[in-house]
Curated annotation (Swiss-Prot):
Gene Ontology molecular function, alphabetical: adenyl-nucleotide exchange factor activity; protein homodimerization activity; protein-folding chaperone binding; unfolded protein binding
Protein name per the record: Protein GrpE
Gene that specifies this protein: grpE
Function: Participates actively in the response to hyperosmotic and heat shock by preventing the aggregation of stress-denatured proteins, in association with DnaK and GrpE. It is the nucleotide exchange factor for DnaK and may function as a thermosensor. Unfolded proteins bind initially to DnaJ; upon interaction with the DnaJ-bound protein, DnaK hydrolyzes its bound ATP, resulting in the formation of a stable complex. GrpE releases ADP from DnaK; ATP binding to DnaK triggers the release of the substrate protein, thus completing the reaction cycle.
Organism, as annotated: Mycolicibacterium paratuberculosis (strain ATCC BAA-968 / K-10) (Mycobacterium paratuberculosis)
InterPro entries listed in its UniProt record: GrpE, GrpE_coiled_coil, GrpE_head
Source species taxonomy: Bacteria, Bacillati, Actinomycetota, Actinomycetes, Mycobacteriales
Amino acid sequence: MTQGNQKTEGNPPEQVTVTDKRRIDPETGEVRHVPPGDTPGGTAPQAATAESGGAATDKVAELTADLQRVQADFANYRKRALRDQQAAADRAKAAVVNQLLGVLDDLERARKHGDLESGPLKSVADKLESALTGLGLTAFGEEGEEFDPVLHEAVQHEGDGSKPVIGTVMRQGYKLGDQVLRHALVGVVDTVTEEGDGEAAATDEPTAAAAETRPPESDDNAGASGD
């Protein structure tokens, strides 16, 4: 034997230890549960994982809050844009209808003169008035209505103003929805209140009673008067 063989026979071979670090057991196919202390640095990775999980939760909450703010801002912007569009459409519609009020005045005068009782002009007037009514145009200002300074413009006034009502309508007013396009030109008079009627009746009754109870003139007085 050589010297090398002698050394090999004198020293027993070192045992090799193989650690199976596979998480799944190849024989059973189940996942192995290794305690944290059995693996080097097992506690530190868990702490790091917990910290990273908390940071991720905070980040998700922050992003969720940002998303909610963006959604609220967009909803407010959408409402504001729709409101502005509607206001612009209402202004444009009011401008067009306002240009046609003079035509309605001419048609009203023609109606009072009996020119719209029949014929093609009546058909045109009916179609125009129907179209404007469909857009929301309404007329106001009729005799007997209470005077409203918001809707009516008084050009003449009779009375002390205690109970003003419309006595004469010079020009009708028009509203488009809730917007006043033109005030009605009216003449205002005062109505007599019920109390005033009662006082007037009470004043007339004693006068009539006195006339009934007055004694007739005698014939002597009548003859003296004749002489």
